[in-house]
Amino acid sequence: MLNYLWFFLAALFEIAGCFAFWMWLRQGKSALWVIPALISLTLFALLLTRVEATYAGRAYAAYGGIYIIASIGWLAVVERIRPLGSDWIGVALCVIGATVILFGPRFSAS
């Protein structure tokens, strides 16, 4: 269950870091936005390594579903944009895929 905490914290810091770059490069804000961006993205990478997984690629793929949930949450809470029905359908499809990756059977590759 601790994996979910790491996934959600990683998503928060990844989105915050990318949003800070967005504010600088797309919204014309000060280059000082790069400082919290780099700190946030570093924390994102460190937190994602805390996930208990044998293979990095599988951890990243499962994380993708959490990232998408968090991104739609960010859209609603931080940017104050109401998600569309198509957003929620996309979230559901991605979460189903991430769940299959996260909880699917593991067979030997030999």
Curated annotation (Swiss-Prot):
NCBIfam families: PRK02237.1. This is UPF0060 membrane protein Pfl01_4105. InterPro entries: UPF0060. It is a multi-pass membrane protein. PANTHER family: UPF0060 MEMBRANE PROTEIN YNFA. Disulfide bonds: none annotated. It is found in: Cell inner membrane. Keywords: Cell inner membrane, Cell membrane, Membrane, Transmembrane, Transmembrane helix. Belongs to the UPF0060 family. GO terms for cellular component: plasma membrane. Its main location: membrane. The chain crosses the membrane at residues 5-25, 28-48, 59-79, 84-104.
